[in-house]
C-alpha cells in the first residue's frame, strides 16, 4: 500500500488540532479576517524590529502569517493562514502547514513574516503550485543584535524570515519543510 502524505496529513492535522482546541481558531478565515489579522501582525513586526517599516517598504513583497499554531503529541503539525502583500496591498492569500513525527508534546502560537528581497524569488514563489521552504527556496531566519536597525544588515538570501511570539522575536525556529499553498479567497 502506497503512503499518500498529501491526503493523510490534512486529516491527521485537523483531527489533532480539533482535539486540542485550536481547530476553529486556526483555519477557514475569510479574506477580511485574514487581512485584519495581518494588519495586527505587521504592527507587531514594526514594533519588534527596529527599522521594520522601512525594511518592508524596500522589499519586493512580504508574506505574513499572523497566527501559526504548532501542536504535537508524538505526531505534530503546524497551520496558519496569511496574506502576500506587494506595495502594502494584499495580492493573494496563503496557508502554511507542516507535519512532524517524534518525541514532542505541547502547543504554541507564533507569527511568521517572510520578506522577499529579490524579484526572481518573488516570481518563483508566486508561480509555484505549492512552495516548500528549503526545497523550492531558502528562507534565512533573521538573526541580529537586539535594538539594532534591520536596515544595517546585509542579507545574502533572497528571502528573509522573521518568527515572533508573545515575547518578541524567537531564535532557533525553523520553517524548513513547511509547505505554503495559495488559497482561493
Question: What does each model-found stretch correspond to?
Answer:
Residues 10-21:
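Bacterial N-terminal signal peptides
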Amino acid at each position: 500500500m502506497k503512503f499518500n502524505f498529501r491526503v493523510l496529513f490534512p486529516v491527521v492535522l485537523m483531527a489533532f488540532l480539533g482535539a486540542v482546541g485550536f481547530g476553529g481558531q486556526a483555519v477557514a478565515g475569510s479574506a477580511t479576517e485574514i487581512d485584519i489579522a495581518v494588519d495586527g501582525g505587521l504592527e507587531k513586526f514594526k514594533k519588534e524590529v527596529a527599522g521594520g517599516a522601512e525594511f518592508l517598504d524596500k522589499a519586493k513583497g512580504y508574506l505574513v502569517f499572523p497566527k501559526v499554531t504548532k501542536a504535537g503529541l508524538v505526531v505534530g503539525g503546524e497551520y496558519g493562514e496569511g496574506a502576500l502583500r506587494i506595495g502594502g496591498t494584499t495580492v493573494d492569500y496563503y496557508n502554511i502547514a507542516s507535519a512532524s513525527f517524534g518525541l514532542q508534546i505541547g502547543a504554541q502560537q507564533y507569527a511568521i513574516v517572510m520578506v522577499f528581497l529579490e524579484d526572481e524569488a518573488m516570481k518563483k514563489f508566486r508561480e509555484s503550485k505549492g512552495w516548500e521552504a528549503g526545497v523550492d527556496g531558502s528562507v534565512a531566519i533573521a538573526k541580529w543584535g537586539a535594538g539594532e536597525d534591520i536596515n544595517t544588515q546585509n542579507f545574502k538570501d533572497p528571502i528573509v524570515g522573521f518568527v515572533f511570539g508573545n515575547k518578541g522575536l524567537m531564535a532557533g525556529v525553523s520553517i524548513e519543510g513547511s509547505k505554503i499553498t495559495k488559497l482561493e479567497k
